[in-house]
C-alpha cells in the first residue's frame, strides 16, 4: 500500500500578488532600422546622439540660455529613444551650468561691491539682490500622448508644464503654431541609396520621363544624393527633386542637423513650391501634373491624397521592406460624394482636433459665421483624436467638418467605419456655394481657406448691394427652390433649419397652446416638431427614435395606471465586493 499522502486536486488557480501585476516584457531590445543594421548595446548611445544631432541641439540651448523649461515631443515610433536623448541633454546642460557658475564665482569682489544695486552679499545678508542659482537650472520634460497627428507641434501639452520651448523629433509638417518657439530635430535615417536607385530603374525604364523625387522630412536629406546619381550617372535628364521649404518657418523656429544641399550647387534653382516642399531642378518645371512622383517612405492618407491631386501618378518606396507600392490610394470620388451630402445637411459638427496650429480659431470663427448665413446649424467639438465611438454619441449631426493638419490630422474614413461623413473646410465651402462646383483640388491650408471664405462673403455682399442699388424688389414670401439629396435623390426639407424658423407659420388652436405645460417634452404641430412652441431639429430627430428617454412610455401605458413603480433599494458596493456578497460570506 502506498504510504504517500493523498492531496486533493486544486479546484481553482492559485492567485498571489504577482498575478495582478503588470506583465513584464522579456525582450528589452527594440527594432531601430532607422539607425542602420550595425546597432549594438555598445554604440547605441553614440548612434542615437548622431541621429538626433544632440550636440548641435545642446549648442543651440547654450546659445539661448533664456529657455529654462524644455519640452521634448517624440512620436510613438521614436519614443523608445527619449530616455537616451534626455540623459545626454541633461549631462551636457548641467556641465555647462557648472562651468557658468564657476566663472561667476571668480568675479572680483570689488566689482560686486561697487555695484549700487547689490550689496555683494559680503556680510552674509539675505537681500533680494542675491542671485538664486536654482533658477538657472534647466528642466526637461518628455511630452506623452501625441500619437495622433504627431507631425504637429503639441503646444497645449507643453503649456501644461509651462514650457518655454518645444523640441519636436521626427517627421514634421512645419505648420506654424500659436505662441511657443520650436526646434525641429528631424533625424538622420540610414537609407540604402543603391537599392532605391535599382527600384527606380525598374519602375521607370524610359530615361526621358518627367519624374519628381520626394520624401518625408527626415529622408529629404537623401534626395539630393539620389538626384545626382540618377541625373548625372544614369542619364535621367528630366528628373527633379524636392527639399524642405524653409520659407514657411517662423523667426523663432530652428532646425538642427539639417543642411540645404542646394546652397552648394549653383546648377539648381527653385522652380515650384508644393506645400511644405520646394522643387529644385536645372530645367524649368511648368506644371507638376505632368510629372510622375517617386516618394520615399509611405505618407499618411491625407498627405497621400494631396499628392495624388498634384502629380500625374504616384509610386511609393518603403525603406523598411525595399519594395514599391503603386496603390490603391485614397480617391477623390468619395470626397465628391461627401461634398454633395454636405449641401443638404442641416446640422454640421465642427471637429477641432488641435488648438496649437496658427489660424485655427480664425478658421473656426469664419466657418461658423458662414454656416449661420446659409441657415445651417452647427456644433463645436474639441475631441482630440476622433474615433467611431466618440462621434457615434452625437446622432443628430448630419455631417462632420474636421479642422486639422493636412499631413496627418484629417480623417478620410477609407473603410466606411464612421456613421456620418467627415469632410474638410474646403469641401464644406464648396458645398455652401450656390453653384455646384468641383475643382478636384485638396486644399487644407487654413490661410487659403480663410481667404476663400472672405471672397465668398464679399461676393454675396456685392450681390446684395447690386440688388439694392438696382431697385429690384425681393419678395420674402417667395417659395425657396426645393432641395434634393444628390446621393439618394430624396427631397430634403431640413437642409436650412435656421432660415426656415423666421418664415415658419404654425396654426394651432389657442387651447392647445395654453396647455403647453404638458408632461410631453416633444409636441408635433401640423407636421412641424417644436419644443415649447419653438422649432428644433433636435426634437425632429428625437421623434424618429423608438426610445425617447425616461418616462417616454408613460402616456402609452395600456393599463392606464398613473401610479409609478415601487421604489426598491438596489445593489450597493463596489464591483469586487457587493453588499450581497458580503452577506453570503457571513452566512
UniProtKB/Swiss-Prot annotation:
The keyword Lipid metabolism does not apply. GO terms for molecular function: 2-(3-amino-3-carboxypropyl)histidine synthase activity; 4 iron, 4 sulfur cluster binding; metal ion binding. The keyword Cytoplasm applies. Keywords: Cytoplasm, Iron, Iron-sulfur, Metal-binding. One of its GO terms (cellular component) is cytoplasm. Its cofactor is [4Fe-4S] cluster. Pathway: Protein modification; peptidyl-diphthamide biosynthesis. GO terms for biological process: protein histidyl modification to diphthamide. It is found in: Cytoplasm. Transmembrane segments: none annotated. [4Fe-4S] cluster binds at residues 152, 173, 405. Residues 555-566 have a biased composition (Acidic residues). Binds 1 [4Fe-4S] cluster per subunit. The cluster facilitates the reduction of the catalytic iron-sulfur cluster in the DPH1 subunit. Residues 549-587 are annotated as: Disordered. It comes from the Eukaryota. Required for the first step of diphthamide biosynthesis, a post-translational modification of histidine which occurs in elongation factor 2. DPH1 and DPH2 transfer a 3-amino-3-carboxypropyl (ACP) group from S-adenosyl-L-methionine (SAM) to a histidine residue, the reaction is assisted by a reduction system comprising DPH3 and a NADH-dependent reductase, predominantly CBR1. Facilitates the reduction of the catalytic iron-sulfur cluster found in the DPH1 subunit. PANTHER family: 2-(3-AMINO-3-CARBOXYPROPYL)HISTIDINE SYNTHASE SUBUNIT 2, DIPHTHAMIDE BIOSYNTHESIS PROTEIN. Belongs to the DPH1/DPH2 family. DPH2 subfamily. Component of the 2-(3-amino-3-carboxypropyl)histidine synthase complex composed of DPH1, DPH2, DPH3 and a NADH-dependent reductase, predominantly CBR1. This is 2-(3-amino-3-carboxypropyl)histidine synthase subunit 2. It comes from Kluyveromyces lactis (strain ATCC 8585 / CBS 2359 / DSM 70799 / NBRC 1267 / NRRL Y-1140 / WM37).
Amino acid at each position: 500500500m502506498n504510504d504517500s499522502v493523498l492531496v486533493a486536486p486544486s479546484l481553482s488557480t492559485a492567485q498571489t500578488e504577482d498575478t495582478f501585476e503588470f506583465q513584464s516584457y522579456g525582450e528589452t531590445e527594440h527594432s531601430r532600422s532607422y539607425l542602420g543594421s550595425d546597432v549594438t548595446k555598445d554604440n547605441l548611445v553614440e548612434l542615437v546622439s548622431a541621429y538626433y544631432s544632440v550636440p548641435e541641439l545642446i549648442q543651440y540651448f547654450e546659445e539661448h540660455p533664456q529657455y529654462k523649461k524644455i519640452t521634448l515631443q517624440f512620436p510613438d515610433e521614436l519614443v523608445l529613444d527619449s530616455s537616451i536623448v534626455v540623459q545626454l541633454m541633461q549631462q551636457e546642460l548641467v556641465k555647462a551650468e557648472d562651468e557658468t557658475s564657476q566663472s561667476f564665482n571668480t568675479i572680483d569682489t570689488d566689482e560686486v561691491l561697487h555695484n549700487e544695486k547689490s550689496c555683494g552679499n559680503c556680510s552674509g545678508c539675505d537681500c533680494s539682490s542675491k542671485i538664486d542659482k536654482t533658477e538657472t537650472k534647466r528642466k526637461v520634460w518628455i511630452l506623452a500622448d501625441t500619437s495622433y497627428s504627431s507631425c504637429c507641434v503639441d503646444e497645449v501639452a507643453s503649456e501644461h508644464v509651462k514650457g518655454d520651448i518645444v523640441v519636436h523629433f521626427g517627421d514634421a509638417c512645419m505648420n506654424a503654431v500659436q505662441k511657443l518657439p520650436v526646434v525641429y530635430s528631424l533625424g538622420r535615417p540610414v537609407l540604402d541609396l543603391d537599392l532605391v536607385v535599382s527600384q527606380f530603374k525598374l519602375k521607370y525604364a524610359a530615361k526621358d520621363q518627367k519624374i519628381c523625387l520626394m520624401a518625408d522630412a527626415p529622408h529629404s536629406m537623401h534626395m539630393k544624393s539620389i538626384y545626382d546619381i540618377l541625373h548625372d550617372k544614369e542619364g535621367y535628364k528630366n528628373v527633379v527633386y524636392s527639399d524642405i521649404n524653409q520659407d514657411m518657418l517662423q523667426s523663432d523656429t530652428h532646425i538642427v542637423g539639417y543642411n540645404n544641399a542646394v546652397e552648394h550647387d549653383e546648377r539648381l534653382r527653385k522652380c515650384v513650391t508644393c506645400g511644405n516642399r520646394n522643387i529644385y531642378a536645372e530645367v524649368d518645371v511648368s506644371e507638376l501634373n505632368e510629372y510622375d512622383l517617386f516618394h520615399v517612405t509611405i505618407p499618411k492618407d491625407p498627405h497621400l491624397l494631396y499628392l495624388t491631386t498634384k502629380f500625374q501618378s504616384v509610386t511609393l518606396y518603403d525603406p523598411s521592406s525595399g519594395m514599391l507600392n503603386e496603390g490603391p490610394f485614397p480617391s477623390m470620388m468619395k470626397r465628391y460624394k461627401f461634398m454633395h451630402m454636405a449641401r443638404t445637411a442641416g446640422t454640421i459638427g465642427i471637429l477641432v482636433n488641435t488648438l496649437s496650429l496658427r489660424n485655427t480659431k480664425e478658421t473656426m470663427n469664419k466657418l461658423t459665421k458662414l454656416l449661420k448665413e446659409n441657415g445651417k446649424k452647427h456644433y463645436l467639438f474639441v475631441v482630440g483624436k476622433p474615433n467611431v465611438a466618440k462621434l457615434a454619441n452625437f446622432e443628430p449631426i448630419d455631417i462632420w467638418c474636421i479642422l486639422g493638419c493636412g499631413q496627418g490630422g484629417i480623417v478620410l474614413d477609407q473603410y466606411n467605419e464612421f456613421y456620418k461623413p467627415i469632410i474638410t473646410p474646403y469641401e464644406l465651402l464648396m458645398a455652401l456655394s450656390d453653384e455646384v462646383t468641383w475643382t478636384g483640388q485638396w486644399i487644407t491650408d487654413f490661410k487659403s481657406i480663410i481667404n476663400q471664405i472672405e471672397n465668398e462673403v464679399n461676393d454675396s455682399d456685392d450681390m446684395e448691394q447690386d440688388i439694392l442699388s438696382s431697385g429690384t424688389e425681393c419678395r420674402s414670401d417667395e417659395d425657396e427652390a426645393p432641395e434634393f439629396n444628390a446621393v439618394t435623390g430624396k427631397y430634403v426639407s431640413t437642409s436650412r433649419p435656421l432660415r426656415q424658423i423666421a418664415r415658419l407659420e404654425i396654426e394651432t388652436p389657442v387651447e392647445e397652446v395654453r396647455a403647453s405645460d404638458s408632461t410631453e417634452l416633444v409636441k408635433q404641430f401640423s407636421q412641424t416638431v417644436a419644443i415649447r412652441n419653438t422649432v428644433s431639429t433636435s426634437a425632429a430627430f428625437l421623434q424618429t427614435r423608438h426610445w425617447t428617454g425616461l418616462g417616454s412610455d408613460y402616456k402609452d401605458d395600456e393599463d392606464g395606471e398613473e401610479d409609478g413603480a415601487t421604489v426598491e433599494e438596489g445593489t450597493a458596493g463596489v464591483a469586487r465586493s457587493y453588499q450581497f456578497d458580503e452577506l453570503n460570506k457571513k452566512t
